[in-house]
């Protein structure tokens, strides 16, 4: 076999390898949300397309989810990423993405807490989904993933929320709109 032939075979094999779920040592809620999101992103659909396709999306998800820690934050906050940022370029997928030094999910927020009394404001819904539901947890992870992946135009798929509740809500609605069909199946 010539060098040229072996190179082509290696490239083709390398490109067809699908990312596999990583084993994470997290609590049940994070594990379930991760598995749900991995399943959503591992097939070709409008949701995975938003994140650059199944290979790119699941590669970044795997790098991201292992960093997630639980923390007590203000109840209005579901998730927080802060600290120094590291930029990654994955040559096999072409993904350019960033990971933050600190990545925390709020134990008192909408990821974990359900609203016992429908008349209460907190924990708040996540998009159109009830707090603490499978769909809400998956939407939270998908929202955060959108802040990490750089689009073809060089900007992040979702602009940083900062402390802007309106921008955060708009980002959540944007993700929900492209992932609605997949999220609805989690109810």
Residue ranges and their predicted role:
Residues 10-138, 148-187:
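Predominantly extracellular/secreted Zn2+-dependent metalloproteases
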Residues 1-9:
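Sec-dependent signal peptide recognition
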Residues 144:
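Walker B catalytic acidic pair
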């Amino acid at each position: 076999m010539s060098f040229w032939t072996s190179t082509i075979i290696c490239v083709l094999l390398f490109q067809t390898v699908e990312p596999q779920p990583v084993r994470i040592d997290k609590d049940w809620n994070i594990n379930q949300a991760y598995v749900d999101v991995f399943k959503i992103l591992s097939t070709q659909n409008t949701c995975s397309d938003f994140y650059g396709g199944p290979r790119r999306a699941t590669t970044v998800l795997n790098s991201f989810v292992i960093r997630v820690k639980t923390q007590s934050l203000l109840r209005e906050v579901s998730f927080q990423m802060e600290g120094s940022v590291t930029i990654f370029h994955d040559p096999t997928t072409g993904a350019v993405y960033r990971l933050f030094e600190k990545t925390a999910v709020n134990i008192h927020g909408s990821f974990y807490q359900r609203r016992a009394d429908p008349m209460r404001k907190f924990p708040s819904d996540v998009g159109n989904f009830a707090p603490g539901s499978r769909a809400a947890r998956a939407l939270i992870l998908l929202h955060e993933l959108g802040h990490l992946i750089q689009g073809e135009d060089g900007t992040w798929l979702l602009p940083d929320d900062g402390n802007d509740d309106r921008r955060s809500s708009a980002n959540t609605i944007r993700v929900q709109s492209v992932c609605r069909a997949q999220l609805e199946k989690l109810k």
